[in-house]
Amino acid sequence: MLKNPFKKKSIADKYQTLIREINALESTVKTLTDGELRNKTNQLKQRYQDEQNLNNLIVESFALTREASYRTLGLRHFDVQLIGGLVLNGGKIAEMRTGEGKTLVATLPAYLNALTKKGVHIVTVNEYLASRDQTSMGQIYRFLGLETGLIQEKMTTPERQRNYKADITYVTNNELGFDYLRDNLALNIRDVFLRPFNYCIVDEVDSVLIDEALTPLIIANSVKTCVDKYIIASEITDYLELNVHFEIDEKNKSVLLTNQGTIQIEKILGVQDLYNPRDPWIPYVINAIRASSLFFRDVHYIVQNNRIVIVDEFTGRIMPDRRWRHGLHQAVEAKENVAIRQTTEITASITYQNFFLVYPKLSGMTGTAKTAEVEFDKIYSLPVEEIPTARPNLRQDLPDLIYKDEFSKWNAIAKECQNISLVKQPILIGTTTVEKSEMLAQLLQEYRLSHQILNAKPENVRRESEIVAQAGKKGSITIATNMAGRGTDIILGGNIQFKVRKDLYNILVTYKYQTKENKKDSLSRSLQIFPLLKKLQRTSQKFLTVLNCLINNKQFLNLSDVEVLKILNESELIRVPKISYQCSMKFLINELVNFEKKTQKLDNVIVKNLGGLYIIGTERNDSQRIDNQLRGRCGRQGDPGKSRFFLSVEDKLIRLFGDARLENVLKSQLLDDLPLESELVTKILDSAQKRVEERNYELRKNLFDYDDILNKQRNVVYYERRKVLESESARIKILAYGEQVISEITSKLRRKKVFGSQLISRIRNLLGTKFLLNFPSSDLNNLESIDFQTYLLQEFWLSYESKILELEVEYPGIIQEFERTLILIYMDREWKEHLQKMSLLRDAVGWRKYGQRNPLSEYKEDAYKLFKYRGIVTRHLVIYELLRSSIL
């Protein structure tokens, strides 16, 4: 039978040869001892040094990683996971469903690329995931002779440097981006954290490169803030009426004052012009209106410890280090009557779009990338490959139900939970904001339905892993804001490891305190407190013996409760503990797991028979990817599951982006409390969602186009800066600057027809009286411009060298440090000024389209002029400072 030449190759077909070769090598690798397996790493490193070709090492390195994983973690990579590893190594995005083992897949390309000795970064969206993955997967790398690093928020400079020097480093996108910016503000090479970039794997790549693309990373300095104006502007909003004094654009989160509004505000303030540049009120007023009408508590932010903390709309997590720009954050602080912090000016900034493009080799993994593959390809040159599942997907996505209003929708959700809870099927409800999660929790309470809630509130965040892990438990109801980057698998019947760790923690802490207080019969007391111990007394006497020994271990008794909890949490990740009390705790956990297994297996079967986890979405998100992230929480690894979205006509997506067809259908068919289930409505909603996604893509593309211009300039500045930072002496740079400055000064003065003694006087004023100019002024008028420049250059060199010699006698070695630091300080200062100007230019250039001019072309042209001017000013300031400084 002839093959169809037009049939598209499946991903399995693409990598079939390599998979076959890796599998063929498996039996050989299995015969190697642990030492021989470890020695293979050095052999592969040497082969790379000789051949400079990683492709020749793929088969052997993947086979070694698979075997090391089995020996350390008891986990063997499936063939589909090998495919995922090959996709990642090829500089692509691997789309893998929830529960398919992305964390394990990343070990394959990470180990391979670490053989270059240039370092590998594995980027996660939060510290919990980075720490968890480094602890568990680090065992594989260490077994193979590689070092792993972990970057955490409060690490010192030496700790960061040590961890970045590891072969494979786990780090959050936030920490990595800020460390890059800090490196490019360092005044001494000893303070630099990062080595040159090599290879990066981004977990939840769509969250980082798409959802956070519009939010730049910013390092800023505080500047003087007019607090009173923010407070007064906030109070003024109480006297303004929507659509009378101002209009809002909810889609773009913008505000427009009407003429009546302008007059009203000027009257209240007692000023003649809100736009007066000497005493401007307009930015304060606009931000105050935006804060009161478009930014809401427990939706866009929470108030924590008398501070405004932004909530990430895509992940539902708080972002304590982020602040809104251009005075908006201060306006929200004034609205909430909390302390108003100072405004800032940008010192350094970069978007994730441009930051990750610094890597020579980049790849990513996520459960939801296919819907954004055009953007990944056009902006990042990252193709998306869908990885097949190890088992068939049994999830059932039910049609949306749409209700007349929000009241009917929320009541329907509560009733659905009530009905489902009767059969004990677990339910996970996804909400879009903190406010709605709290409101639904209150509603379920009225229905007397027991539930767990996970949102950005600190008291809930602390229990995140446990809440998510137990969402598959029989009869559980869990309310959670968006599920991106939660990182914990939901196991049907409940997660036995989390239950066991919680039970054992309570037992150990109670038992420990009783022992410390020298209470007699602490065991019998514990048996009364914990019924679980009574059951174990009948089945495992060894458990109680080990428990008794542990409680009498002095090292263990000196541990804090937090340290006990940390050891318990890491016990699942560490297969072979090294400390005696860790061994005892590992044994106790294993005993409890074996004891609970029978019950958990039974619950697992029951929940599967009930249909698995039931996902309820309470609103369609702006992006289909976010909806798919929620749906993807059920049906993991061949489990059953179902999902359904409950919607209302008042939902944001329908209200802002629905079209006339949808409105007509809904008005004609919707009745009180009765939902509409229609394929047409679902298609119209999909279409509305697509329009929002296209609009957001255009926003990100537009940002990228503009930011690309600034990024090219940033790359030039950072390259020049690094050369100065790494140089032993900046003397050549100083001399080059001097030549350029003198050339620029003389050319400018001659254009202004300044000659003779007047020329000498002007140059002395500019460069300082110490500048040696002994040339007879009578001869100056007869000199050509180029000859005069040569003379000035010679005098500059002589003046500068004489000062250096004097300084070296008094302060040996200081001049080199001084030269280098001075250049860096002025580079940074002028770059900061340049960023302010570019920001103003970006805001202003948009108006030029009304003059039939292309804003992007205009921006590019003006940006070049500003950048050129920045270079001139930097050179002049450095030379002026060197020649006029008292240190010289």
From Swiss-Prot:
It catalyses: ATP + H2O + cellular proteinSide 1 = ADP + phosphate + cellular proteinSide 2. ATP binds at residues 81, 99-103, 489. Its EC number is 7.4.2.8. It is a peripheral membrane protein. The keyword Plastid applies. Pfam families: P-loop_SecA, SecA_DEAD, SecA_PP_bind, SecA_SW. Keywords: ATP-binding, Chloroplast, Membrane, Nucleotide-binding, Plastid, Protein transport, Thylakoid, Translocase, Translocation, Transport. The keyword Translocase applies. CDD domains: DEXDc_SecA (cd17928), SF2_C_secA (cd18803). It is found in: Plastid, Chloroplast stroma; Plastid, Chloroplast thylakoid membrane. GO terms for biological process: intracellular protein transmembrane transport; protein import; protein targeting. It comes from the Eukaryota. InterPro entries: Helicase_ATP-bd, P-loop_NTPase, SecA, SecA_CS, SecA_DEAD, SecA_motor_DEAD, SecA_preprotein_X-link_dom, SecA_SF2_C. GO terms for molecular function: ATP binding; protein-exporting ATPase activity. One of its GO terms (cellular component) is chloroplast thylakoid membrane. It is an enzyme of class 7 (translocase). Belongs to the SecA family. Has a central role in coupling the hydrolysis of ATP to the transfer of proteins across the thylakoid membrane. NCBIfam families: secA (TIGR00963). This is Protein translocase subunit SecA. It comes from Trieres chinensis (Marine centric diatom).
